Amino acid sequence: MNENTTPLHPAFLTRMKEMLGNEYPSFLSSFSAPRTYGLRINTSKITCEDFENLSPFPTRQIPWIKNGYFYDEDIRPSRCPYYQAGLYYLQEPSAMTPASRIPIEPGDRVLDLCAAPGGKATAAGAALQGQGLLVANDISTSRARALLRNLELFGIPNVFVANETPAKLTKAFPEFFDKIILDAPCSGEGMFRKEEALAKDWTPEKSLELSEIQKELILQAADMLRPGGLMLYSTCTFAPAEDEQTVSHLLENRPDMELAEMEDYEGFSHGVPEWGNGNPELTKCIRIFPHKMNGEGHFLALFRKKGQAIKESSRPHTKPDKNAFPLIEEFLNEIGLKTLCGQPFDWERVEIRGDKAYYLPPVAHNFRGITFLRNGLYLGDLKKNRFEPSQPLALAIRKDEAEAVISLSASDERITRYLKGETLNIEPEEAAHKKGWHLLCADGYPIGFGKLVNQILKNKYPAGWRV
């Protein structure tokens, strides 16, 4: 996009000139520069070193994101089998920054309050390594469905995908979470170069309207944070009303919240106290400008809730219905699966709802009354005298966890045919067993299930996932 094809609103330009001073010409020139493209490695499935050795297309490390890489505009990483295996997430480089600046650890209870389409939620889920709990919420049902798909693709088993209002979540989770991500709905000024429609629709009033929503959201989020916990607030806008002023609003209304330092980078700019309420602590906020970084515009602030965390013991799961367990156990034995996401398979976490089996997150909680799309990992369906595994289960299995595998090169045309829903011819030496359920892998990384009969792999890749 450039200034001539999509004129920027005069009020926006006037404000940016006042904000940036002598940097304004460089900022304006950035709108004529090509945008950058990035992908983030799913470190719960593959190391960055292994990805670099495997990648069939050239990449360059994003210097401020440990597991982030630039790729060229003419490359289509979503067409690569590694994408279907959930090894990476396509994300604008600056948008990777917020999740990289909140230190999520395995076992944490994490909330992503406005999570769709899943860029930050998948990053948080990967950091949890299958331990703890991730509550990923979006108020829009259609967006929550897209969020669920991305979490399934990433193989995140310990997630509760909610489709609820923040006000209702606040009542359900008072001071419950160790870490919270609030990527607030905003005017999107930082994305004008990437999405021209945002620039066309911008008005001076929109930013003020959204700032009122953000002020409400940030207070609600703070109420769900445990003492000693961390909360990351981010926007993709330059507007002080949505950035420093929203941060100031929280600090003024919640004296138990304070700003925390984040890992810095030479290209980052920082919050400006005068753009908020004058609090010098606002310099701890980070601003990303497109004329100073290889990325779009972003703002982020990290908060800590004062006080000491009191670790509560997790409540036990409800007593599982074990009538269906033999069918599931028979399948797990057939494919030789004893661990899931590096953790021993825990039968206490298996829940049967109707004819479907789920693997609940290790942190049990009473979610009654909350509208949700998924609680845990969808294992599969119970059909008469057999168990049919799900696609999310296939993607939650890590490399080398299952024994009954058929591992082909990602460049093997049979992988492409499998992803289209076709049956495959398999040589005897390529399969672990002569018949039965197998996990098809691309260079060892699971893509989906198939059933082997007479050297023919019957395709079990769901129609809704096919490419």
Region annotations inferred by a language model:
Residues L128-Q129, L225-P227:
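Helix-to-beta-strand junctions that scaffold the AdoMet/dcAdoMet cofactor pocket
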